[in-house]
Amino acid sequence: MIKANTILGNKFVAKNRTGASYFLSSEELKSLGYIDINRALKAVPGVNFYEEDGFGLRPNISLRGTSPQRSSKITLMEDGVLIAPAPYSSPAAYYFPSVLRMEAIEILKGSSQVQYGPFTTGGVINMLSSSAPEEGLKAKFQTSYGSFNSSQIHSSVGRSTENLSYLFEYLSMNSDGFKKLNSGENTGFNITDLMGKVRLKSAEDSATPQFLEFKYHFFDELSNETYLGISERDFNTNPFDRYAASQEDNMDARQVQLMLTHSISISEQFKIVTNVYDNTFSRNWYKLSGVVVDDSKKGLETVLAAPSNYPNHFAVLKGLTDSEDDALFVKANNRVYTSRGVQTKLDYHWYGKSGIFHDLEIGTRLHYDEEDRFQWEDGYRIQNADMLSTSEGIKGAKGNRISSATAWATYAMYKLKYNGLSLSPGLRVESIKLGREDFGKSNPNRNSSDLSSRENQITALIPGIGFNYTFSNQLSVFGGLHKGFSPPGNTPGEQAEESINYELGSRFSIGRLSGEFIGFFNDYSNLLGSDLAASGGTGSLDQFNAGSVHVSGLELLLNYNLAAENAAVQVPITFAYTLTNAIFQSNFGSDEDIWGVVSTGDRVPYIPQNQWTLTARLEHKKYELNLSSRLSGVFNTQAANGNQSTVEQVPSNFIVDLSAKYHLTKQLRLTAQIVNLFDEVYLVSRVPAGFRPGHPFGVYTGLQFDL
């Protein structure tokens, strides 16, 4: 039977689904205590990512080899509704929910994805926010402080009665950042999260149990983050430097979500769940975009790729020399995103002859989203390593357009269970109308005189089928076949990204050892790349066809408890390994030069071939100790074959984190966390422009109190 806002709901469902899935429970999230979603997901097989800012503010997540840039090729949801700023028209996740306010995370991969879209190739990540208590009054307060003047305050209070429940939550995260400007200015962030939920419930003995829940969420971020990295030489000597020309860079962002959920069980066999949602995300990322010397303007990535070729430009970026007026251009990437819609799903199940279980789930969603760009570029000069304003740009001159999408999606999923066999065929339909209205560079009032429009429409049928066969409580086999889909852009005639995806796996339990082993193969007929500034592009968001690609891989998950028979102490160990081979099957050259010149046999950028994670926990009623280690394999930022030099390469790294918790009383606990235990200096990315370091050694201590 369907649940209101969840995909899985618990680990048992995840282990019995006809497709690869993972349920990251509340206990796991609490034991890790991460604010960085990348670190929270690192133990999940099939999840690839590359870091950018060291705190996970804007993650780049890939599932099974999808393009990771800004997590724009996976379906992101919070409480069962789409949460990316504009999921169809501009899916790049410049907003990502704070992992600290989540009570669980659900990851779905493989063949049973037709219920969720629009991105069906890699998978789904559904973030489950804190829920009201099931009974009585509950409250919690936790705080921490540590390296780089970083602090957190997280508190909530909730109550549940027979007909009413509510939860109010507050989260504040702050840091001065670990990168250093010579001026000593802050390079960190300030984030505030507020959430409220109120649920009206029918009586427990009602013939038709139902509830109506209203959710409000507010998010505010001010982060002094930049796209400007540093040169390779400077990275090798002072990896945490920030150049003077980035001192004005900052992201000012705000997100508001309104959501209404209604759930009714008409009978024990028939249930309907409806969501109405409205998300608004506004942001202005004011950041350096170019440098001019002697009337020669160069992009940041051009200068940092070869500083010796542009010594004067490079000196201005570092603040080593005074410049002319308007030597530095800082772009106001000012955008407002809207995402709203209504979705409903119904579930009816029954038992037929010979004990065969049948379940039919049907869902539909009407959705609209848009990205409104109104951007400009200001001029600055450098004097004594300080930036001084010299000119104000014309509003709208660097982007004055609205991209939008109207989408209707529906699906039907049938499930059959007989003895140990489960089958789940399904079909999804996506009908999408994408458009763009460009008002021109010199039309701040947006009259129709300079308006140019374009439109693209597509309707896609997305079938899939999965199976699971349980031989015993210790062994099952599952697999499936489904069509992968990713919406195109608004360029007329542009085709969607399509693939045929296969998977086959087994779940097993042998004594203290349990786990799963999965093989997958994704056959792309036309992989779509996106021109994102975050990956070194121009930021137009236009998509380009990268041709045929084969992505194959293996996922291994092992769980073993060293002290399973010890009542006083538990020592669970988890090992996760992912092998991913993402290979181009054709030649092409990207006009945007994001991936470089591609030849058959080259590896798709940003996808490491190997990665593994090993975690060990020591659990006692008075204390907990968690050790987590991860090896991230080498990857390239441009297409590469096995013999390519390291010019565009991000080397592998091995990082260990440690956390501990001590229970002073039943309600009061002390916490401690060490990030990057051995203080490894490691490169996480060469994009958007220059070298970027990972989080250095950091110590954080805190206090938790529950009522």
Regions found by a protein language model. Name each.
Residues 1-30, 38:
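Short, acidic, small-residue-rich periplasmic hinge/interaction motif at the N-terminus
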Residues 38-81, 85:
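Extracytoplasmic beta-strand/coil segments of soluble accessory domains associated
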Residues 81-109:
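Short acidic/polar hinge/loop motifs at secondary-structure boundaries
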Residues 112-114, 124, 128-159, 170:
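Short strand-turn segments of transmembrane beta-barrel domains in outer membranes
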Residues 145-174, 182-226, 250-254, 260-266:
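Transmembrane beta-barrel wall of Gram-negative outer-membrane proteins
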Residues 205-213, 253-439, 558:
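Face-selective signature of the C-terminal outer-membrane beta-barrel domain
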Residues 337, 354-361, 365-369, 398-524, ...:
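Structural signature of Gram-negative outer-membrane beta-barrels, strongest in the C-terminal barrel
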Residues 417, 472, 544-639, 666, ...:
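Gram-negative outer-membrane beta-barrel transporters
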